[in-house]
Amino acid sequence: MQESSTKHVVKEDNITNNGENENNGITEPLLFFNYHEFLTENYNVHPSCRHNSKARSIVVNHFPNNHVPIDSSMYSDTRIVRIPRIFNTIQLSDIIPQFSNYTPGTEPAAINDQQGFTFKPVGIYDNNSFGETSVTPLVPGYMTEEEFHTIIDNINKYLHEAFSPYNVWNLFDSILDLLSANFYNKIVNNFLVDTYSKRKLLELEMYIENDINLGMFASRPGLKILSPRKSGYLSVCIDYYNSHQNHCTNYLA
């Protein structure tokens, strides 16, 4: 099996300390792409493309649902699109998780073609359909761009409030914990009252479950967002039942 990563590769000795590409004295910002996706040349031609020449490679950008048992029907019936963390939108992005609000396939370094923002399957890999570009079936197939941006922006807002060390309530909790020699965090937080950070993370859980899964997606059975807590806040996940063989359906992870 021959697989390769996406198209932008920069030599390490050209990377500056601030994450920019320095080439021949010219400093250019590094371009962002969904680093979960990869290319493969080892695939079968999609039935709809039998009469076309085989593309050199396809972009694998949705994945098996690893949040359910591998022998379950849901594992075979759902797919995951992983929305990655991004690190250049705020300060302290290493401790405050933030996720890319680029619609999948529109990232600055995404792989595109002349067809624009359209998912066109050309190959079958691991019994699922993929195209030549970074565009996934997720948007606009199962949600609009506006819905996608609203969801990701709100998730980012909750996470910023929960993890920012400069939030006044987080500072208050930290001071109490320091003055009590960790008694506040160990005892009070566990048995009496939650810290501000924990309350905000619980609000995020309720937003995802009630406002999105049971609200916005109520008329779209099977489509739902998984809590980013399940991926260790490394990605955001959406799940949709795969109703057709070799037809891509999704998760946002």
From Swiss-Prot:
Localization annotation: Endoplasmic reticulum membrane
Q: What is its main location?
A: endoplasmic reticulum
UniProt feature, compositional bias: Basic and acidic residues: 1-14
Spell out the GO cellular component terms annotated for this protein, sorted alphabetically and separated by semicolons.
endoplasmic reticulum membrane; endoplasmic reticulum palmitoyltransferase complex
Domain of life the protein comes from: Eukaryota
Keyword NAD appears in the UniProt entry: no
Q: How does it assemble?
A: Interacts with ERF2.
Q: What does this protein do?
A: The ERF2-ERF4 complex is a palmitoyltransferase specific for Ras proteins. Palmitoylates RAS2, which is required for its proper plasma membrane localization.
Q: Which family does it belong to?
A: Belongs to the ERF4 family.
Name the chain's protein.
Ras modification protein ERF4
Q: What's the source species for this entry?
A: Debaryomyces hansenii (strain ATCC 36239 / CBS 767 / BCRC 21394 / JCM 1990 / NBRC 0083 / IGC 2968)
